[in-house]
Amino acid sequence: MAIKEETEESCGSRAVVASITKESPRQHRMKLEVYGEVLQRIQESNYEEANFPGFDDLLWLHFNRLPARYALDVNVERAEDVLTHQRLLKLAEDPATRPVFEVRCVQVSPTLNGNSGDVDPSDPAVNEDAQSSYNSRSLAPPTFGSSPNFEALTQAYKDHAQDDDSAVNAQLPNSRPMHEITFSTIDRPKLLSQLTSMLGELGLNIQEAHAFSTADGFSLDVFVVDGWSQEETEGLKDALKKEIRKFKDQPCSKQKSITFFEHDKSTNELLPACVEIPTDGTDEWEIDMKQLKIEKKVACGSYGELFRGTYCSQEVAIKILKPERVNAEMLREFSQEVYIMRKVRHKNVVQFIGACTRSPNLCIVTEFMTRGSIYDFLHKHKGVFKIQSLLKVALDVSKGMNYLHQNNIIHRDLKTANLLMDEHEVVKVADFGVARVQTESGVMTAETGTYRWMAPEVIEHKPYDHRADVFSYAIVLWELLTGELPYSYLTPLQAAVGVVQKGLRPKIPKETHPKLTELLEKCWQQDPALRPNFAEIIEMLNQLIREVGDDERHKDKHGGYFSGLKKGHR
């Protein structure tokens, strides 16, 4: 059973997108330096707030409640924006007014690291465009400047377009007015998905995004968008207000997407003593807690902890939900995970043992996977796959996913962190907290998962089906091939923007086997209808394994397929 750690990035949980982790001494020093410079600029500019008693302490409190990344990214030349963030976070404390937001027009430059790239300043069209942008008034840059991430996204698309003639012909960001929208509200699960969905409803394209969570449970989300035809902001503000009111006026049964508007402190009081799991009367999953022995903590996340232990003398993994963090949404996912896993029986899917559905001891028990996750093997232990072992892992995953799809189960969060290895070097699919049984119509609309691995149709909140898992599988294959984190130079939201609007994909190494390159490109097609299903993927992998040759199928005599992982545990 996999569990999300604090450092993972997911749109399903705010805490993992911008988690407040312990700062290093270097980060703390840099935060202090930025704080000092912002304070000095505010005082020198004679802002009214600078005269408030204890303002310097309040400003430091503002920086200290936000992660170090906020201080490192903020444009110190725009000290007034820090005051805006302070004000919004204060207003967000009132349930009657949140979510609160601010809108302003900004100018985004296309220059990359001080170079104009392909932009020719002598081009009359460029000059005309620049004149039309600047004539009326001088616009300020975004709060976080023309950030390295935004520049990286632009450059990455250029590189991608040069390497791939079939790249999506999307327009690169140019020097034109855009709008910066800053939201603040109570911190809630899936908040980022809800905000991006609302912006999408207004026809706005997110070009840059910065998401922060405060240590005391609030959010600060800054989006740079285009798609609004006018530079003025009042019309956009009115449109945002109407969109918020529209969501608030929806019947309770349709308010799954607007939990960020209110924070119900009484939620825990309404939670049932026992979680109801749908049943057909053919099986039992409730475990005998007296037979469950918890031994060693393996991982800890925002909403649960993973332990190693035994159940009836069998070695097991035990995922325990933290009672103080349990809410109605978590109970739905817990119920769904038990409902799906109790029916799953396949050698490439982690085996479900049972669950305790009685509060406060909510837990799920599965077989223990001794070798941990593929994510840890690649990124923590710096393991490397040879081509034959890579294909073996890819085949294991595709078999597990094919079984799930044959049983109308869409995983929705396929990534290396959810792929586990047992003592026999068999890789299995795990973590069904956000998986769903496909509807009779064959399409689904609820968004979830992890942005770096997520299919474009899911990011855009469009109807989707099992082929969304195929896209995620392609990103997993690329990760196995390179050992790198997908789009590591971008934040998760910026990666999502690139995938949807720029046709961005990870760069395939030139030395990759041509058939593997072909498989990757088929699986991450923008159009889901062009992607193969897992039965077809299995056939392609078997053919590729035969082509690679029998001599590479055997394990390394010293370490097996996962020798890098074994070394990491010495």
From Swiss-Prot:
Regulation of activity: Activated by autophosphorylation at Thr-445.
Pfam families attached to this UniProt entry: PK_Tyr_Ser-Thr
Protein name: Serine/threonine-protein kinase STY17
PTM section of the record: Autophosphorylated on serine and threonine residues. Autophosphorylated at Thr-445.
GO biological process, any: chloroplast organization
Cellular component, GO annotation: cytosol
Function: Serine/threonine protein kinase that specifically phosphorylates chloroplast precursor proteins in the cytosol within the cleavable presequences (transit peptides). May be part of a cytosolic regulatory network involved in chloroplast protein import. Does not phosphorylate mitochondrion precursor proteins. Specific for ATP and does not utilize other NTPs. Plays a role in chloroplast biogenesis and differentiation in cotyledons, possibly through phosphorylation of chloroplast preproteins.
MF GO annotations: ATP binding; protein serine kinase activity; protein serine/threonine kinase activity; protein serine/threonine/tyrosine kinase activity
Provenance organism: Arabidopsis thaliana (Mouse-ear cress)
Note: Plants silencing STY17 does not show visible phenotype under normal growth conditions, but plants silencing STY17 in the double mutant sty8 and sty46 background show more severe retarded growth compared to the double mutant itself.
Family affiliation: Belongs to the protein kinase superfamily. Ser/Thr protein kinase family.
Reactions performed catalytically: L-seryl-[protein] + ATP = O-phospho-L-seryl-[protein] + ADP + H(+); L-threonyl-[protein] + ATP = O-phospho-L-threonyl-[protein] + ADP + H(+)
Region (Disordered): 112-145
Active site: 413
Residues with Phosphothreonine modification: 445
Compositional bias per record (Polar residues), positions renumbered to this chain: 129-145
Claim: Nucleotidyltransferase is one of the keywords in the record: no
Domain Protein kinase: 292-545
Key words, A-Z: ATP-binding, Cytoplasm, Kinase, Nucleotide-binding, Phosphoprotein, Serine/threonine-protein kinase, Transferase
Modified residues (Phosphoserine): 441
Enzyme Commission no: 2.7.11.1
Compartment annotation: Cytoplasm, Cytosol
UniProt KW GTP-binding keyword: no
